[in-house]
Regions:
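A conserved beta-strand-loop-helix scaffold within acyl/acetyltransferase catalytic domains
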Residues: 2-64, 107-137, 141-253
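Conserved beta-strand-loop-alpha-helix junction that forms the acyl-donor binding cleft
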Residues: 105-115, 278-285
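A general structural signal for short secondary-structure junctions and capping/turn motifs
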Residues: 33-36, 94-97, 128-131, 268-269, ...
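A gly/proline- and charged-residue-enriched helix-loop-helix capping module
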Residues: 69-111
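Active-site/acyl-donor-binding loops of N-acyltransferases
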Residues: 59, 120-149, 272-329
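Aromatic (often tryptophan-rich) hydrophobic motifs at membrane interfaces
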Residues: 72, 90-94, 193-312
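Short, high-confidence coil segments that cap the C-terminus of an alpha-helix
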Residues: 39-41, 98-102, 216, 272-274
């Protein structure tokens, strides 16, 4: 028999053998979001014997949303390897009707059927589910190539830039956490075009954890001894994740950011032998220079159709759907 329970601490995730393929599916990540990110967990757990599935959520206004922030590339249900996902998710969907009238799930990966599984379960549980694309994920499938072969497939302008500028910049890539290098990264980020770091303590603690586990790849580019560009990557399960990158204005004439990116790709492809490079969310044009494929990120907006506050949302969705239909000639 399936039992559904609710928890205001993420500790419950640590006691379960939940499968985690990405940094954003580990219990430690949700602990960081709660402890350093300042978020208040609302974890929904369905269990049937040894089978379990969890939805790490939080309250936002009158709705439930994923326990996530801007550092999270994606979000999805966490399950034990043998879990009956449809049955457990449907049980959660039915029970959540007692807790809220609206739940928004995003950004959900398109490629692993998490979005379709959630949508089917919540529709079976009596929810009206609105689905849309909310973001874009740029990736590179290495497909056994060496870095040299990969670089040969890049645009000619990029290869020319690297030939002209590579010798003017010194690059280093660390796989362990170094406080001095991290301070250099923070200084570069603070003086770059990027907005102020939202949760610097959380990001540092994440970097420390990844460094202790051997997953950190922290790159720094220097010119005449001064750090002018930095990138924060991690490597896990044959995938390299590009978390943060920044450079100061003085780095632009030297193309230091480009030179550092090339060094990071070389480390990931030839050094770490990854199968995939994940550039996170955001459809920035520069990502297309390095990456070869995009994947959709999905938003599911789930409403209880009998609740009055749901009616305006459902009405607007109906109007948009009708307006998008081709008109008869």
């Amino acid at each position: 028999m399936i039992a559904v329970s609710y928890h205001d601490r993420v500790n419950v995730l640590q006691s379960l053998p939940l499968a985690s393929a990405t940094p954003f599916e580990r219990a430690e990540w949700f602990s960081l979001l709660a402890e350093e990110g300042g978020l208040s967990p609302f974890v929904v757990l369905a269990q049937d014997g040894s089978e379990a599935i969890a939805l790490p959520l939080m309250r936002e206004g009158g709705a439930l949303v994923p326990l996530a922030n801007w550092y999270s590339f994606s979000w999805g249900p966490l399950a034990t390897p043998d879990a009956d996902r449809p049955a457990l998710l449907t049980a959660i969907a039915c029970d959540l009707a007692r807790k809220t009238h609206r739940i928004t799930f995003a950004p959900i990966p398109e490629e692993d059927e998490a979005a379709s599984g959630l949508a089917a379960a919540f529709r079976a549980g009596g929810w009206a589910v609105l689905e849309e694309t909310c973001d874009t994920n740029h990736i590179l499938r290495v497909e056994g190539r060496s870095y040299e072969a990969y670089l040969a497939s890049r645009p000619g302008q990029l290869r020319t830039t690297l030939k002209r500028k590579a010798k003017k910049v010194e690059v280093g890539v660390l796989s362990c956490f170094d406080p001095e290098v991290w301070r250099a990264y923070q200084e570069i980020y603070a003086n770059s075009w990027k907005p102020a770091e939202g949760k610097p303590a959380m990001l540092r603690r994440f970097a420390e954890q990844e460094g202790a586990a051997g997953r950190l790849r922290l790159g720094i580019a220097r010119h005449e001894g001064r750090a002018i560009a930095a990138q924060f990557w991690t490597v896990e399960n044959a995938t390299a994740y590009i978390h943060k990158l920044a450079h100061v204005e003085e780095a632009v004439p030297l193309s230091a950011g480009t030179v550092l990116t090339a060094a990071m790709f070389a480390q990931a492809i030839d050094g770490d032998r990854v199968d995939l490079v994940d550039f996170g969310t955001g459809d920035d044009p520069y990502k297309g220079i390095w990456m070869e494929e995009t994947r959709r990120r999905i938003r599911l907006d789930c409403h209880r159709p009998g609740h009055p506050t749901s009616w305006p949302h459902l009405a607007r969705a109906t109007v948009r759907k009708l307006a998008s239909r081709p008109r008869a000639v």
